[in-house]
Amino acid sequence: MSCDRGSFVASRASGLRRAIVTASGILALALSASLWPNSAAKAQETQIIYPGSMAVTGFPGTVTPDFDSSDSGKGGLPPGSDPVDETFIDTSQASLRIFNVSRLGGPASGQLVYTPPPFEVTAGQVGEVFGLTYDDGVRDGVPSGIPNLYAAATSLHGIEIVTPDADDDGRPERQRRGTAGAVFMDGQFGTENGGGPGTIWKIDGISGAVSKFADIDTNSGPGIGNLAFDPTHREFFASDLDTGLIHRIDVDGNLIDTFDHGVAGRPAHGLAPVADDGAVMDIQAAAFDSEDPDTWGYTQDARRVWAVAYHGGRLYYSVGEKAEIWSIGIASDGSFAGDPRWELTVKAGQDYAVTDIAFDNKGFMYLAQRGPAENRYDYGRFADSGKGEVIRYQHEDPDDPATESVWVEVPQEYAIGFPQGNRQSAGGVDLQYRYDAEGNLDTSVCTDTVVNTGDKLRDNPELAERLAAGGPLAVHGVQLTPSALVKPANVPPFGSWFVDFDGYFEDPDVQGHVGDVRVWRPCEGRAGYYEEIPGGYLPPFYPPDFLPPGNLPPCLDVADVQYFCTPRGLQADLYLHDHAGLGGDSIKAQSKTPGVAVTSPMSHAPGKPYTIDITGHNPGETVNVGLCFYRKSDQDKGGYYPCCKMTLPLRTPDVSCEGRDR
């Protein structure tokens, strides 16, 4: 299923523009102009995802019949009709885009960034999607260095239903209320390609091909809150807004099992269990109202899981509108460990759902709020936005025994958008590499930039003159901000860059049209996979991902190991002895023990030990760590480079660094 189309300019454009001035006063949301001409997205032969690639979901826009046509059977508007009744999701436009944001064009000054044409996946292919995640790029057991992207069906961009054509105009009939014969509108859930409200779609990172990966077929319409990938056990997690269950899914798309927070999680914090009430979305029942999310079959708020994120051997997740953050351990076999733990209750200006969670490599947890779901019949508003925050928490250091949580009580907040209050979050957040002083991506620093989705990001009448120098004001998309710039810094956010989702700037009043954001950010180097030993390498130097013979003398030894507990988990400081005289100054580390995750920073201070983080292990367990010792200057040249490899058995201390129970 390729996405084969040209620019946003279409033959319907004149009619769409005219809709703005009709007596009904509706806002025409169909795209009539594009920032990216000829931005066709077809199946590729190379790759569509690179380090730093930024995937964003959002509403694709609408299409309305040509008002100038006198023949309604050829697309015209029947006399006396309300244009809104004849306005549909534009299945030819994108609900998912993958942006190249490697060069932002200059220092941050609050400006709009003009990116190369993004890769696009249309609503006709996948319908409306929100949650995103990447896998690890392993293909047929071989690491390729190019991941696949996954996108989940959503109701957060509205629920639209239709019945068969009744007035012989060649189009179905829009319905506000449930009625016999109603079905989901084309472009809602990708039903034309076998999709539904519980579908997770896979976008191949090399070819761009789109396929159905998994289906939670019990989901009646609320859709999926978000997705997470566990690289240690190579499995996925998806939060089900219909039942409140967290589904565990294998790499082939098979549903394995579930975790029920309402029943099994809440009692761990002294709360009464809450079972699913069994409510479903029935679009053929009179009680269904497309403009009232309370009729959509969402599970109760107390058990409604929105965001999911795997970190440090645990799955973190958010619950409810007055958001709480919880976590549950993932056992060595990948199963739910049965140890749910309340982490914190979010402190923010509004009791809004946290629809996305991200972690950096410094121990911070980032949360993005999204305003309550809405669904205006004219497609103008899908969320009550303008008060949603992006905040971050860190572990108490040292831990304060007088507080209930191991996290600090008051989070740090980012200034999101230019409107008054700077709280324009649309519910997506992730981390990006660092950008240098000229706005160029620096992949040597892993989590130095916060990226988040938002509405009306550059709209502020009081600052209009200054903002105009940086591009259009009606920007609904992504804000990129150096992670150090928490409030009161960067207020207003002239220290940020902005990217528009659809390249259309004549829609200042829409809300909730942007969804999630996810960055492909490999942080442990990208050695790649080599099928044969390249020339020029003598023992004991081998390409980083090539397994050397087992009869070579050791090229590296460990003189000492010291362990510390940090907010990230167990830290091991390695003092290395360079037997081979390589002169290395960097390491890459990976776990060779199933169920255990090992990470290493991409930089090393001269004279200091080499540091690795270990998570997912049992106290006292011996963890086999694969080390690659190399010179960064060799790596920076590109291509193959010498690497001294060894497997190091580390016996971990008989203590847990996962934090104390409350």
Per-region residue spans from a language model:
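Extracellular acidic, Ser/Thr/Pro-rich low-complexity tracts
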Residues: 576-582
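Surface-exposed, short loops/turns at beta-strand junctions within beta-sandwich domains
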Residues: 613-623
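Bacterial N-terminal signal peptides
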Residues: 21-34
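N-terminal secretory signal peptides that target proteins for export/translocation
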Residues: 1-18
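Short strand-edge motifs at loop-to-beta-strand transitions and within beta-strands
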Residues: 608-612
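Short, solvent-exposed loop/linker segments at the N-terminal edge
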Residues: 562-569
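Sequence/structural signature of beta-propeller domains
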Residues: 41-552, 556, 570
